[in-house]
From Swiss-Prot:
Gene: RSPRY1
Phosphoserine modified-residue sites: S50
Protein name, UniProt field: RING finger and SPRY domain-containing protein 1
GO BP terms: proteolysis involved in protein catabolic process
Zinc fingers, RING-type class: 527-562
Organism encoding this protein: Homo sapiens
Statement: the UniProt record of this protein carries the keyword Zinc-finger: yes
Gene3D superfamilies, sorted: 2.60.120.920, Zinc/RING finger domain, C3HC4 (zinc finger)
Length: 576
């Protein structure tokens, strides 16, 4: 929800500022003097004396820029179509670095309060975004993120991702300048080992850029020096959090096939085999490293002779797990189906394999990371809109507990609860009482008052479900092992009543799943969405007819022309 609301605000603000600047230009022309227009513009904008004020003479900039062309484009807006914002002009003294640092820290301080799509982003985020519209400003923001985000804040890496993801794309010159400034190599990775925050933040920035610039730009960014730096950060002498984000950065670079080949040739799999043993480590930071190492070995950097984890994991006692067929695309699920992690910039969600319609049910979650996750209950009607920032608790068919921001979520609205912020190792309990139509949330055995809002929309068909912000991870217990804090009332567990075939328990690595999809033959007359049923339905009024009735009933607009669907007409009888 944070990312979506922020994007909407920026779009509307950009349009409004463009209109305002156009109006000022006409006023200046009418008055016949740039000075009068300048006075009017500056008097309307109140700023403090911190050096972040936007004292810009828009008309003077336009006059100077047109009169004195310059070859240096680093201080020019990147997008010539979008109207320039009121930012620092090309001849205004450079903002002091400590002011950029202050804006970054201010954003980190208020990020927990951004809970509503209708909520205006804080001034610090708006200002940082405006600064990043020039190459010089973008470089200042990136260097500040590396310099000042503290190691101990659980939302630090997520703030790096949030700010960079919403900033304008860097130019080729800006990327080149960044690599020159950082000057990364294996020796740099060994420096300042007693201050790991800088290396953690550097890896987080590189990973975010690799994800955002997948393709030729990502290939250019992965220089021999940067590859050497990231591989050196994976050595056992490094701090676990540095190892974690270096590995995540390498994963994101590997989204481009040429980079994947380059990284694989570096013998990275030999290092990951050692780190894989940390997957069940009692140290939750090492556990994250182990989880990501195992996932990379199974999905990206395959090692010859190594058996894939899903082929050797013991699932005999597991009868309910996270559903790998009911999950948004970037969520990582462990081979035993009980642990999930998100390293993408989107808000990833998943449901359990077992659905309940009556009775009293309970499950627990162990918090591995203490950042933003929304965990609770959802029906099949609850939508996963990961790129828009909507997850569990963001519609009328789900309700979620958020232990980081200390909120209960329902229908995209939140209310505070009295539990303290969760931390690594905490146990969150989720009780669903369909007899009394209530949900009860527990933190380490301490319960909150019952929640009943969701039952105004639905009374059955509930799944355990969760949504994850960037770099978050937790483990689910559906009853395959004893609960840490079982409630006092009588309840049932998923594992006692669910059933999965051996085939349904398998969570295939992505390359195996893709190989199977390539073997699937698709009939010419099949539905273009599900590729399973016959395309037997025509949409009115547009007339498109390449869908089955089941898929057509789930749509409000035509997926081809985006026209609203008024009616659906079945053209032929269903043929199996």
């Amino acid at each position: 929800m944070i990312v979506f609301g922020w994007a909407v605000f920026l779009a509307s603000r950009s349009l409004g500022q463009g209109l305002l600047l156009t109006l000022e230009e006409h006023i200046a022309h009418f008055l016949g003097t740039g000075g009068a227009a300048t006075t009017m513009g500056n008097s309307c904008i109140c700023r403090d004396d911190s050096g972040t004020d936007d004292s810009v003479d828009t008309q003077q900039q336009q006059a100077e820029n047109s009169a004195v062309p310059t070859a240096d484009t680093r201080s020019q807006p990147r997008d010539p179509v979008r109207p320039p914002r009121r930012g620092r002009g090309p001849h205004e003294p450079r903002r002091k670095k400590q002011n950029v640092d202050g804006l970054v820290l201010d954003t980190l301080a208020v990020i927990r309060t951004l809970v509503d799509n209708d909520q205006e982003p804080p001034y610090s985020m708006i200002t940082l975004h405006e600064m990043a519209e020039t190459d010089e400003g973008w470089l200042d923001v990136v260097q500040s993120l590396i310099r000042v985000i503290p190691l101990e804040d659980p939302l630090g890496p997520a703030v790096i991702t949030l700010l960079l993801d919403e900033c304008p794309l860097p130019t080729k010159d800006a990327l080149q300048k960044l690599t020159e400034i950082l000057n990364l190599n294996g020796e740099v990775a060994c420096q300042d080992s007693s201050h790991p925050a800088k290396h953690r933040n550097t890896s987080a920035v590189l990973g975010c850029l690799a994800e955002k610039l997948a393709g030729p730009a990502s290939i250019g960014l992965l220089s021999p020096g940067i590859l050497e730096y990231l591989l050196q950060c994976l050595k056992l002498q490094s701090h676990p959090t540095v190892m974690l984000f270096a590995l995540i950065a390498l994963e994101k670079f590997a989204q481009t096939s040429e980079n994947k080949l380059t990284i694989s040739e570096s013998s990275i799999s030999d290092r990951l085999v050692t780190l894989e043993s940390w997957a069940n480590d009692p140290d939750y930071l090492k556990r994250q490293v182990g989880f990501c190492a195992q996932w990379s070995l199974d999905n990206l950097f395959l090692k010859e002779g190594r058996q894939l984890t899903y082929e050797k994991v013991n699932l005999s006692s597991i009868r309910a797990m996270l559903n790998s067929n009911d999950v948004s695309e970037y969520l990582k699920i462990s081979p035993h189906g009980l642990e999930a992690r998100c390293d993408a910039s989107s808000f990833e969600s998943v449901r359990c394999t077992f659905c309940v319609d009556a009775g009293v049910w309970y499950y627990e979650v162990t918090v591995v990371t203490s950042g933003v996750m929304q965990i609770g209950w959802a029906t099949r009607d609850s939508k996963f809109l990961n790129h828009e920032g909507y997850g569990i608790g963001d519609d009328e068919y789900s309700c979620a507990y958020d232990g980081c921001r200390q909120l209960i979520w329902y229908n995209a609205r939140s209310k505070p609860h009295i539990h303290p912020c969760w931390k690594e190792g905490d146990t969150v309990g989720f009780l669903l009482d369909l007899n009394e139509k209530q949900m009860i949330f527990f933190l380490n055995g301490n319960q909150l008052p019952p929640e009943k809002q969701v039952f105004s929309s639905t009374v059955s068909g509930f799944f355990a479900a969760a949504s994850f912000m960037s770099y978050q991870q937790c483990e689910f217990n559906f009853g395959a092992k004893p609960f840490k804090y079982p409630p006092s009332m009588k309840f049932s567990t998923f594992n006692d009543y669910a059933f999965l075939t051996a085939e349904e328990k398998i969570i295939l690595p992505r390359h195996r799943r893709l190989a199977l999809l390539k073997q699937v033959s698709i009939r010419e007359n099949c539905c273009s969405l599900c590729c399973d049923e016959v395309a037997d339905t025509q949409l009115k009024p547009c007339g498109h007819s390449d869908l089955c009735m089941d898929c057509a009933l789930q749509l409000e607009t035509c997926p081809l022309c985006r026209k609203e669907i008024v009616s659906r007409i079945r053209q032929i009888s269903h043929i199996s």
